[in-house]
Protein backbone atom coordinates (compact mmCIF):
# COMPACT_ATOMS: atom_id res chain seq x y z
CA UNK A 1 0.00 0.00 0.00
CA UNK A 2 1.16 3.53 -0.76
CA UNK A 3 2.95 5.41 2.00
CA UNK A 4 0.55 8.31 2.60
CA UNK A 5 3.38 10.45 3.96
CA UNK A 6 4.34 10.95 0.32
CA UNK A 7 1.21 13.06 -0.14
CA UNK A 8 2.24 15.49 2.62
CA UNK A 9 5.24 17.66 1.64
CA UNK A 10 6.30 18.46 5.20
CA UNK A 11 7.63 14.92 5.66
CA UNK A 12 9.85 15.12 2.57
CA UNK A 13 11.02 18.59 3.61
CA UNK A 14 12.07 17.33 7.04
CA UNK A 15 13.80 14.29 5.53
CA UNK A 16 15.72 16.51 3.10
CA UNK A 17 17.12 18.42 6.07
CA UNK A 18 17.92 15.13 7.84
CA UNK A 19 15.57 16.26 10.59
CA UNK A 20 13.66 13.44 12.30
CA UNK A 21 9.93 14.14 12.37
CA UNK A 22 7.23 11.90 13.77
CA UNK A 23 4.01 13.86 14.05
CA UNK A 24 1.66 12.57 16.75
CA UNK A 25 -0.41 15.69 17.41
CA UNK A 26 -3.14 15.52 14.77
CA UNK A 27 -5.86 16.17 17.35
CA UNK A 28 -4.42 19.68 17.66
CA UNK A 29 -4.05 20.23 13.92
CA UNK A 30 -3.28 18.10 10.89
CA UNK A 31 -0.56 18.35 8.27
CA UNK A 32 -1.70 19.32 4.77
CA UNK A 33 -1.56 17.20 1.61
CA UNK A 34 -0.05 18.75 -1.51
CA UNK A 35 -3.41 19.13 -3.24
CA UNK A 36 -4.72 21.33 -0.42
CA UNK A 37 -1.64 23.55 -0.62
CA UNK A 38 -2.03 23.69 -4.40
CA UNK A 39 -5.71 24.61 -4.20
CA UNK A 40 -5.01 27.59 -1.94
CA UNK A 41 -1.95 28.71 -3.93
CA UNK A 42 -3.74 28.39 -7.27
CA UNK A 43 -6.66 30.48 -6.03
CA UNK A 44 -4.36 33.32 -5.03
CA UNK A 45 -2.10 33.11 -8.08
CA UNK A 46 -4.45 32.37 -10.96
CA UNK A 47 -8.14 32.67 -10.06
CA UNK A 48 -8.50 35.20 -7.25
CA UNK A 49 -11.84 37.01 -7.09
CA UNK A 50 -14.67 37.53 -4.64
CA UNK A 51 -17.76 35.31 -4.42
CA UNK A 52 -21.52 35.87 -4.54
CA UNK A 53 -21.21 39.54 -5.48
CA UNK A 54 -20.11 40.10 -9.07
CA UNK A 55 -21.07 39.13 -12.62
CA UNK A 56 -17.62 39.06 -14.22
CA UNK A 57 -16.36 35.64 -15.25
CA UNK A 58 -13.58 35.10 -12.71
CA UNK A 59 -15.99 35.88 -9.87
CA UNK A 60 -18.63 33.58 -11.35
CA UNK A 61 -16.10 30.77 -11.64
CA UNK A 62 -14.91 31.15 -8.05
CA UNK A 63 -18.49 31.41 -6.80
CA UNK A 64 -19.29 28.12 -8.54
CA UNK A 65 -16.23 26.42 -7.03
CA UNK A 66 -17.06 27.87 -3.60
CA UNK A 67 -20.64 26.56 -3.78
CA UNK A 68 -19.39 23.13 -4.83
CA UNK A 69 -17.49 22.83 -1.54
CA UNK A 70 -20.71 23.27 0.41
CA UNK A 71 -22.06 20.24 -1.44
CA UNK A 72 -18.88 18.27 -0.67
CA UNK A 73 -19.32 19.03 3.03
CA UNK A 74 -22.98 17.99 2.83
CA UNK A 75 -21.91 14.60 1.51
CA UNK A 76 -19.15 14.24 4.14
CA UNK A 77 -21.60 14.66 7.02
CA UNK A 78 -24.57 13.03 5.21
CA UNK A 79 -26.80 16.10 5.53
CA UNK A 80 -30.08 16.40 3.62
CA UNK A 81 -29.29 19.70 1.88
CA UNK A 82 -26.32 21.97 1.29
CA UNK A 83 -28.43 24.79 2.78
CA UNK A 84 -27.80 23.05 6.12
CA UNK A 85 -24.06 23.77 5.86
CA UNK A 86 -22.84 27.06 7.36
CA UNK A 87 -19.21 28.08 6.92
CA UNK A 88 -17.63 29.47 10.09
CA UNK A 89 -14.11 30.28 11.25
CA UNK A 90 -13.79 26.93 13.03
CA UNK A 91 -15.32 24.75 15.73
CA UNK A 92 -14.94 27.43 18.39
CA UNK A 93 -16.61 30.07 16.21
CA UNK A 94 -19.43 27.67 15.34
CA UNK A 95 -20.10 26.86 18.99
CA UNK A 96 -20.08 30.54 19.92
CA UNK A 97 -22.49 31.31 17.06
CA UNK A 98 -24.81 28.61 18.35
CA UNK A 99 -24.52 29.68 21.97
CA UNK A 100 -25.49 33.28 21.19
CA UNK A 101 -28.23 32.51 18.67
CA UNK A 102 -29.77 29.69 20.71
CA UNK A 103 -29.87 31.84 23.84
CA UNK A 104 -31.50 34.66 21.89
CA UNK A 105 -34.29 32.41 20.60
CA UNK A 106 -34.90 29.33 22.70
CA UNK A 107 -33.42 29.80 26.17
CA UNK A 108 -35.46 31.94 28.57
CA UNK A 109 -33.98 33.76 31.52
CA UNK A 110 -33.39 31.09 34.10
CA UNK A 111 -33.37 28.42 31.39
CA UNK A 112 -30.77 25.66 31.30
CA UNK A 113 -28.15 24.47 28.82
CA UNK A 114 -26.38 21.18 29.52
CA UNK A 115 -22.75 20.32 28.76
CA UNK A 116 -20.70 17.43 30.08
CA UNK A 117 -18.37 17.78 33.06
CA UNK A 118 -15.36 16.97 30.85
CA UNK A 119 -15.54 19.51 28.02
CA UNK A 120 -12.99 21.27 25.87
CA UNK A 121 -13.05 24.96 26.74
CA UNK A 122 -14.72 25.78 23.40
CA UNK A 123 -17.85 23.85 24.37
CA UNK A 124 -18.15 25.20 27.88
CA UNK A 125 -16.90 28.80 27.84
CA UNK A 126 -18.97 29.62 24.75
CA UNK A 127 -22.14 28.58 26.54
CA UNK A 128 -21.18 30.09 29.90
CA UNK A 129 -20.48 33.49 28.34
CA UNK A 130 -23.71 33.53 26.30
CA UNK A 131 -25.82 32.19 29.17
CA UNK A 132 -24.37 34.71 31.60
CA UNK A 133 -25.43 37.53 29.29
CA UNK A 134 -28.86 35.99 28.82
CA UNK A 135 -29.43 35.19 32.48
CA UNK A 136 -29.66 31.46 31.78
CA UNK A 137 -27.68 28.65 33.38
CA UNK A 138 -25.13 26.03 32.34
CA UNK A 139 -25.33 22.72 34.17
CA UNK A 140 -22.95 19.77 33.91
CA UNK A 141 -23.80 16.19 32.98
CA UNK A 142 -21.77 13.56 34.83
CA UNK A 143 -19.53 11.25 32.82
CA UNK A 144 -18.37 7.75 33.70
CA UNK A 145 -14.70 6.87 34.15
CA UNK A 146 -14.71 5.69 30.53
CA UNK A 147 -15.74 9.20 29.48
CA UNK A 148 -19.22 8.17 28.38
CA UNK A 149 -22.10 10.47 29.27
CA UNK A 150 -24.09 9.24 32.27
CA UNK A 151 -27.44 8.82 30.51
CA UNK A 152 -29.34 8.54 33.79
CA UNK A 153 -27.94 11.89 34.91
CA UNK A 154 -28.70 13.40 31.50
CA UNK A 155 -32.31 12.23 31.72
CA UNK A 156 -32.63 13.61 35.25
CA UNK A 157 -31.45 17.05 34.09
CA UNK A 158 -33.71 16.96 31.03
CA UNK A 159 -36.64 16.01 33.21
CA UNK A 160 -35.89 19.08 35.33
CA UNK A 161 -36.45 21.26 32.26
CA UNK A 162 -33.17 21.76 30.37
CA UNK A 163 -33.78 23.17 26.89
CA UNK A 164 -30.48 22.46 25.10
CA UNK A 165 -27.61 19.95 25.25
CA UNK A 166 -24.12 20.36 23.77
CA UNK A 167 -21.60 17.51 24.03
CA UNK A 168 -18.45 16.31 22.25
CA UNK A 169 -18.57 13.52 19.70
CA UNK A 170 -15.07 12.39 20.66
CA UNK A 171 -13.18 13.66 23.71
CA UNK A 172 -9.92 15.43 22.91
CA UNK A 173 -8.48 14.08 26.18
CA UNK A 174 -9.67 10.47 26.43
CA UNK A 175 -10.79 9.66 22.89
CA UNK A 176 -14.13 8.43 24.24
CA UNK A 177 -16.82 8.23 21.52
CA UNK A 178 -20.32 9.23 22.62
CA UNK A 179 -23.34 7.20 21.40
CA UNK A 180 -24.90 10.12 19.55
CA UNK A 181 -27.98 8.33 18.25
CA UNK A 182 -28.88 7.16 21.75
CA UNK A 183 -28.22 10.60 23.24
CA UNK A 184 -30.27 12.34 20.53
CA UNK A 185 -33.25 10.06 21.11
CA UNK A 186 -33.19 10.85 24.81
CA UNK A 187 -32.77 14.61 24.29
CA UNK A 188 -35.63 14.79 21.78
CA UNK A 189 -37.89 12.76 24.06
CA UNK A 190 -37.84 15.79 26.36
CA UNK A 191 -38.31 18.30 23.48
CA UNK A 192 -34.79 19.66 23.85
CA UNK A 193 -32.12 20.19 21.18
CA UNK A 194 -28.72 18.53 20.72
CA UNK A 195 -25.51 20.11 19.43
CA UNK A 196 -22.31 18.11 18.92
CA UNK A 197 -18.72 19.34 19.03
CA UNK A 198 -17.35 17.23 16.21
CA UNK A 199 -13.79 18.58 16.17
CA UNK A 200 -12.34 15.14 16.96
CA UNK A 201 -15.07 13.16 15.23
CA UNK A 202 -15.34 14.54 11.70
CA UNK A 203 -11.69 13.83 10.75
CA UNK A 204 -11.71 10.21 11.90
CA UNK A 205 -15.18 8.64 11.95
CA UNK A 206 -17.87 8.17 9.29
CA UNK A 207 -20.38 10.98 9.94
CA UNK A 208 -24.15 10.62 9.44
CA UNK A 209 -26.06 13.48 11.02
CA UNK A 210 -29.38 12.24 9.64
CA UNK A 211 -28.98 8.71 10.99
CA UNK A 212 -28.00 10.04 14.41
CA UNK A 213 -30.71 12.75 14.28
CA UNK A 214 -28.47 15.37 15.88
CA UNK A 215 -29.71 18.94 15.50
CA UNK A 216 -26.30 20.60 15.06
CA UNK A 217 -22.78 19.33 14.36
CA UNK A 218 -19.68 21.55 14.35
CA UNK A 219 -16.11 20.93 13.18
CA UNK A 220 -12.92 22.59 11.90
CA UNK A 221 -11.13 22.38 8.55
CA UNK A 222 -7.61 22.43 10.00
CA UNK A 223 -8.23 19.18 11.90
CA UNK A 224 -9.43 17.46 8.72
CA UNK A 225 -6.33 18.21 6.60
CA UNK A 226 -7.63 21.57 5.34
CA UNK A 227 -6.55 25.18 6.01
CA UNK A 228 -6.90 27.10 9.25
CA UNK A 229 -9.55 29.77 9.71
CA UNK A 230 -12.48 27.83 8.27
CA UNK A 231 -15.02 25.52 9.85
CA UNK A 232 -18.48 24.07 9.45
CA UNK A 233 -21.73 24.29 11.36
CA UNK A 234 -24.32 21.76 10.26
CA UNK A 235 -27.86 22.47 11.39
CA UNK A 236 -31.24 21.02 10.47
CA UNK A 237 -32.78 23.37 7.92
CA UNK A 238 -35.94 24.14 9.89
CA UNK A 239 -33.86 25.00 12.96
CA UNK A 240 -31.38 27.21 11.09
CA UNK A 241 -34.33 29.05 9.56
CA UNK A 242 -35.59 29.86 13.06
CA UNK A 243 -32.29 30.97 14.58
CA UNK A 244 -31.35 34.66 14.34
CA UNK A 245 -27.99 35.77 12.89
CA UNK A 246 -25.36 36.97 15.34
CA UNK A 247 -23.25 39.11 12.98
CA UNK A 248 -24.30 41.74 10.48
CA UNK A 249 -22.67 42.69 7.20
CA UNK A 250 -22.68 42.24 3.47
CA UNK A 251 -24.32 39.36 1.64
CA UNK A 252 -26.60 38.26 4.49
CA UNK A 253 -29.56 40.61 4.09
CA UNK A 254 -32.18 40.55 1.30
CA UNK A 255 -33.90 43.85 2.05
CA UNK A 256 -32.44 46.40 4.42
CA UNK A 257 -34.88 48.16 6.70
CA UNK A 258 -33.47 49.85 9.77
CA UNK A 259 -36.40 48.64 11.87
CA UNK A 260 -37.08 45.22 10.35
CA UNK A 261 -34.40 43.94 7.93
CA UNK A 262 -35.23 40.86 5.88
CA UNK A 263 -32.33 38.44 6.14
CA UNK A 264 -31.37 35.93 3.49
CA UNK A 265 -32.25 32.32 4.33
CA UNK A 266 -29.71 29.99 5.92
CA UNK A 267 -26.86 29.51 5.44
CA UNK A 268 -26.26 33.02 4.05
CA UNK A 269 -27.72 34.91 7.03
CA UNK A 270 -24.96 33.40 9.20
CA UNK A 271 -22.11 34.29 6.81
CA UNK A 272 -21.84 38.07 6.97
CA UNK A 273 -19.02 39.75 5.06
CA UNK A 274 -16.47 38.49 2.57
CA UNK A 275 -15.81 34.86 3.49
CA UNK A 276 -12.55 32.96 3.76
CA UNK A 277 -12.66 31.88 0.13
CA UNK A 278 -9.19 30.34 0.09
CA UNK A 279 -10.01 28.40 3.24
CA UNK A 280 -13.22 27.02 1.76
CA UNK A 281 -11.49 25.96 -1.46
CA UNK A 282 -8.73 24.33 0.58
CA UNK A 283 -11.33 22.48 2.64
CA UNK A 284 -12.88 21.24 -0.58
CA UNK A 285 -9.50 19.94 -1.73
CA UNK A 286 -9.03 18.19 1.63
CA UNK A 287 -12.40 16.46 1.29
CA UNK A 288 -11.52 15.42 -2.26
CA UNK A 289 -8.32 13.88 -0.92
CA UNK A 290 -10.16 12.05 1.86
CA UNK A 291 -12.88 10.86 -0.51
CA UNK A 292 -10.13 9.30 -2.59
CA UNK A 293 -9.25 7.19 0.45
CA UNK A 294 -12.83 6.68 1.78
CA UNK A 295 -14.10 7.30 5.30
CA UNK A 296 -14.12 3.55 6.00
CA UNK A 297 -10.46 3.18 5.03
CA UNK A 298 -9.51 6.09 7.29
CA UNK A 299 -11.53 4.69 10.20
CA UNK A 300 -10.21 1.14 9.84
CA UNK A 301 -6.58 2.26 9.54
CA UNK A 302 -6.71 4.64 12.49
CA UNK A 303 -8.57 2.21 14.75
CA UNK A 304 -5.98 -0.48 14.02
CA UNK A 305 -3.13 1.93 14.79
CA UNK A 306 -4.78 3.23 17.96
CA UNK A 307 -5.35 -0.32 19.21
CA UNK A 308 -1.72 -1.17 18.46
CA UNK A 309 -0.56 1.92 20.36
CA UNK A 310 -2.86 1.07 23.28
CA UNK A 311 -1.43 -2.46 23.54
CA UNK A 312 2.15 -1.21 23.43
CA UNK A 313 1.50 1.39 26.13
CA UNK A 314 -0.02 -1.21 28.43
CA UNK A 315 3.37 -2.97 28.47
CA UNK A 316 5.10 0.07 30.01
CA UNK A 317 5.05 0.13 33.84
CA UNK A 318 3.38 3.17 35.34
CA UNK A 319 1.37 4.21 32.29
CA UNK A 320 -2.21 5.16 33.17
CA UNK A 321 -4.45 5.53 30.11
CA UNK A 322 -7.44 7.79 30.58
CA UNK A 323 -10.89 6.88 29.32
CA UNK A 324 -12.05 3.80 27.44
CA UNK A 325 -10.57 0.34 27.84
CA UNK A 326 -8.92 -1.32 24.87
CA UNK A 327 -12.20 -3.13 24.07
CA UNK A 328 -14.34 0.04 24.04
CA UNK A 329 -14.83 2.51 21.16
CA UNK A 330 -12.14 5.17 21.00
CA UNK A 331 -11.15 7.91 18.58
CA UNK A 332 -7.65 8.19 17.14
CA UNK A 333 -6.00 9.47 20.32
CA UNK A 334 -4.83 8.35 23.73
CA UNK A 335 -4.30 10.57 26.76
CA UNK A 336 -2.12 9.26 29.57
CA UNK A 337 -0.22 9.98 32.73
CA UNK A 338 2.94 8.11 33.73
CA UNK A 339 4.10 7.50 37.29
CA UNK A 340 7.29 9.34 38.18
CA UNK A 341 7.40 11.43 35.00
CA UNK A 342 5.84 14.82 34.32
CA UNK A 343 4.22 15.05 30.86
CA UNK A 344 6.06 18.31 30.12
CA UNK A 345 9.44 16.68 30.80
CA UNK A 346 8.52 13.77 28.56
CA UNK A 347 7.30 16.10 25.84
CA UNK A 348 10.62 17.95 25.88
CA UNK A 349 12.67 14.74 25.67
CA UNK A 350 10.48 13.36 22.88
CA UNK A 351 10.87 16.59 20.93
CA UNK A 352 14.67 16.31 21.16
CA UNK A 353 14.28 13.08 19.18
CA UNK A 354 11.88 14.58 16.62
CA UNK A 355 8.61 13.29 18.07
CA UNK A 356 5.73 15.76 18.38
CA UNK A 357 3.10 15.05 21.04
CA UNK A 358 0.78 17.26 23.08
CA UNK A 359 1.37 17.88 26.78
CA UNK A 360 -0.55 19.96 29.30
CA UNK A 361 -4.25 20.31 30.05
CA UNK A 362 -5.30 20.06 26.37
CA UNK A 363 -7.49 23.20 26.60
CA UNK A 364 -9.80 21.02 28.68
CA UNK A 365 -9.34 21.86 32.35
CA UNK A 366 -12.81 20.49 33.21
CA UNK A 367 -11.62 17.09 31.96
CA UNK A 368 -8.44 17.39 34.02
CA UNK A 369 -10.59 18.01 37.09
CA UNK A 370 -12.87 15.06 36.26
CA UNK A 371 -9.93 12.63 36.14
CA UNK A 372 -8.03 14.43 38.90
CA UNK A 373 -4.90 15.07 36.86
CA UNK A 374 -2.99 18.27 36.24
CA UNK A 375 -1.31 17.47 32.94
CA UNK A 376 -1.62 14.75 30.33
CA UNK A 377 0.61 13.43 27.57
CA UNK A 378 -1.53 12.89 24.48
CA UNK A 379 -0.70 10.92 21.35
CA UNK A 380 -3.08 11.55 18.46
CA UNK A 381 -2.93 9.92 15.06
CA UNK A 382 -3.61 10.92 11.47
CA UNK A 383 -3.87 9.12 8.17
CA UNK A 384 -0.13 9.59 7.54
CA UNK A 385 0.93 7.66 10.64
CA UNK A 386 1.99 4.01 10.63
CA UNK A 387 3.28 1.33 12.98
CA UNK A 388 6.85 2.52 12.49
CA UNK A 389 5.87 5.87 14.01
CA UNK A 390 4.37 4.13 17.01
CA UNK A 391 7.34 1.80 17.44
CA UNK A 392 9.73 4.77 17.42
CA UNK A 393 7.54 6.67 19.89
CA UNK A 394 7.46 3.70 22.28
CA UNK A 395 11.23 3.25 22.00
CA UNK A 396 11.97 6.91 22.73
CA UNK A 397 9.34 7.07 25.46
CA UNK A 398 10.92 4.13 27.29
CA UNK A 399 14.38 5.66 26.87
CA UNK A 400 13.10 8.99 28.21
CA UNK A 401 11.52 7.29 31.20
CA UNK A 402 14.80 5.55 31.96
CA UNK A 403 16.55 8.94 32.01
CA UNK A 404 13.92 10.56 34.24
CA UNK A 405 13.69 7.65 36.69
CA UNK A 406 17.42 7.19 37.28
From Swiss-Prot:
What biological processes does GO assign it?
cysteine metabolic process
Name the cofactor(s) required for activity, per the record. pyridoxal 5'-phosphate
Q: Which reaction does it catalyse?
A: (sulfur carrier)-H + L-cysteine = (sulfur carrier)-SH + L-alanine
Q: Which UniProt keywords apply?
A: Pyridoxal phosphate, Transferase
Please name the Pfam families in this protein's record.
Answer: Aminotran_5 (PF00266)
Query: Which positions bear N6-(pyridoxal phosphate)lysine?
Result: 223
Kind of enzyme, top EC level?
A: transferase
Enzyme Commission (EC) number:
2.8.1.7
Q: Name one GO molecular function term.
A: pyridoxal phosphate binding
Q: Where is the active site?
A: 363
Origin, by domain of life?
A: Bacteria
Bilayer-crossing regions: none
The job of this chain, per UniProt, is described as: Catalyzes the removal of elemental sulfur and selenium atoms from L-cysteine, L-cystine, L-selenocysteine, and L-selenocystine to produce L-alanine.
Q: Which PANTHER family match?
A: CYSTEINE DESULFURASE, CYSTEINE DESULFURASE 1, CHLOROPLASTIC
Q: Which family does it belong to?
A: Belongs to the class-V pyridoxal-phosphate-dependent aminotransferase family. Csd subfamily.
Query: What's the protein name?
Result: Probable cysteine desulfurase
To which species is this protein native?
Answer: Chlamydia pneumoniae
What gene is this protein translated from? csd
Amino acid sequence: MKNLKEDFPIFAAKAKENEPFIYLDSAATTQKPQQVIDAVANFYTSSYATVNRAIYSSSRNVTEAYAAVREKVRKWVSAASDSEIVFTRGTTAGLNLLAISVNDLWIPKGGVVLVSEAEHHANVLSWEIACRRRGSLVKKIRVHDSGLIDLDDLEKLLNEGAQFVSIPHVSNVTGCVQPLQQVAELVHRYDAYLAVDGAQGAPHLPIDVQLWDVDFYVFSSHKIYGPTGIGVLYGKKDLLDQLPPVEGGGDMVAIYDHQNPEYLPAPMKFEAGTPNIAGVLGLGAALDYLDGLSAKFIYDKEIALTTYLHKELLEIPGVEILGPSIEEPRGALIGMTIDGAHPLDLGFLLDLRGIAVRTGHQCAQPAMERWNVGHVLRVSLGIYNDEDDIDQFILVLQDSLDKIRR
